[in-house]
Amino acid sequence: GFRLSKRWIGNGLLLLGAMIWGAAFVAQSVGMDYLEPFTFQASRCLLGAVVLLPVIAVMDRKGVSRRPVTREAKKKQLLYGFLCGVIIFAACSLQQCGLLYTTPGKSGFLTSLYIILVPLAGLLFGRRVKPWVWGSVVLALVGLYLLCGSTDFSLGAGELLTLGCAVAFCCHILVIDKITGQVDGVRLSCTQFFVCGCLSLICAFLWETPRWENILACWIPIGYAGIFSSGIGYTFQIIGQAYTEPTVASLLMSLESVFSVIFGWLILRQRLTPTELLGCLLVFSGVLLSQVPGKAPKLQESH
């Protein structure tokens, strides 16, 4: 029926978002050769916000956007955009700082722990999660563990910072889930990246030495990360989450790790080990299992 098709549209958008983010790992690793972390983050976020402005203008002209008309609605839109921008900034910055003290593999795995944090946090708010979705989460976690090749688990500064990043991403998913029906998705995405870009820019000027020539030398990775990963990928997340429950959304978004390995292999010619391949298969299986339609009601909330 119609409900199913809406769900598939939502899931499809989240899947596309995960693909776009997976390829962004390649752009980020190339970008880091030229730019310091906050400079790169500021460039991609501000570009992402700017790219969405003409989209908003066209949507307004065609009358397809959920434009806030009243002052109350405008205030709500700005407030939520600001909140999401601060959360995204915290998540990305914690991940970036964590990478100074831990390996990319561990960082990837610890970041993806949001897939277990989302249903756990949901329980606190009285949200029911279907039993097989828990199975999906466990399958995906085992897969991500294999994929990231993290063996020893000492908890140092890097690991704790990256766990903070996972908590921030979990908050972002839950906030989007809460507000998705109340605001225009593209406007929200644009506002959150403007906020995240400005905060990153302040940090760049405080702790780094941003140079125009370096930014221009890095235009391809910034262009991809800004236009596709920030501008398009996160907008897909916001729109997709309107039709998908948060735990399933987080599982679909965790495919980002699988795609990053695949694109690393395709573009950067990185080797794919049998263990990583098994990890990819387990994450895919977990996501497929989460798609089993069930009789459980769509998210019951207790107020």
For each of these PLM feature ranges, what is it?
Residues 52, 129-149, 169, 200, ...:
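Hydrophobic transmembrane alpha-helices of multi-pass small-molecule transport proteins
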Residues 19-20, 24-25, 53-111, 146, ...:
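Specific transmembrane alpha-helical segments of multi-pass solute transporters/efflux pumps
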Residues 4, 44-46, 53, 57-61, ...:
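C-terminal-most transmembrane helix of multi-pass membrane proteins
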Residues 1-43, 86, 90, 94, ...:
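Glycine-/small-residue-enriched transmembrane alpha-helix faces in small-molecule transporters
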Residues 39-50, 96-127, 165, 246-265:
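Specific alpha-helical transmembrane segments that line the substrate/conduction pathway
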Residues 43, 107-113, 176-197, 230-266:
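Helix-helix packing/entry segments at the starts of transmembrane helices
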Residues 38, 48-52, 118-119, 154-208, ...:
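Transmembrane alpha-helical segments that form core, pore/gating elements
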Residues 31, 40, 44, 98, ...:
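Hydrophobic/aromatic residues within transmembrane alpha-helices
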